[in-house]
Amino acid sequence: MINDDLIVLLEPIIKNMGYELWGCEYLSQGKHSLLRIYIDKPDGIGIDDCQEVSKQVSAMLDVEDPIPGHYSLEISSPGIPRPLFSIWQYQRYLGYEIHVKTFKPVNGKRKLSGIIVSASGDTIVLDINNEHQEILLSNIVKANLTV
């Protein structure tokens, strides 16, 4: 999971460039770890946008060095199916269906699909087969909008 300190470092740079920091993933794969940063803007993201942000973020990461060890940096659009990281993103997509993978089982399942009914504090509520299910954000490994 990405440290909040990294978000604090990245967000002002990305925002000043006219983009929204959608989220980050750090995938530790032995010697070949990956830091993936998702950016967005109202009219969409293209390759040139990713390259521009990559140059600025890479320079900042080289100076600040917030992540130990070697890793590759990838700048990407959230795309489809859009990953969800923060409570405000769940709030933005109230009424949409999502797929969720959890650390600990919820009603015996670690993979769930449902409609976002509410999102506040540290909890989201999904409508799964007409039953409301609360899920703590801290229990979510990954969540994506359904295509």
UniProtKB/Swiss-Prot annotation:
InterPro entries: Ribosome_maturation_RimP, RimP_C, RimP_C_sf, RimP_N, RimP_N_sf
Key word Cell division present: no
Top-level taxon in the UniProt lineage: Bacteria
CDD domains according to UniProt: YlxS_C
Entry keyword set: Cytoplasm, Ribosome biogenesis
GO biological process entries: ribosomal small subunit assembly; translation
Xref: Pfam families: DUF150_C (PF17384), RimP_N (PF02576)
Function summary: Required for maturation of 30S ribosomal subunits.
Name of this chain's protein: Ribosome maturation factor RimP
Lineage: Bacteria, Pseudomonadati, Pseudomonadota, Gammaproteobacteria, Legionellales
Gene: rimP
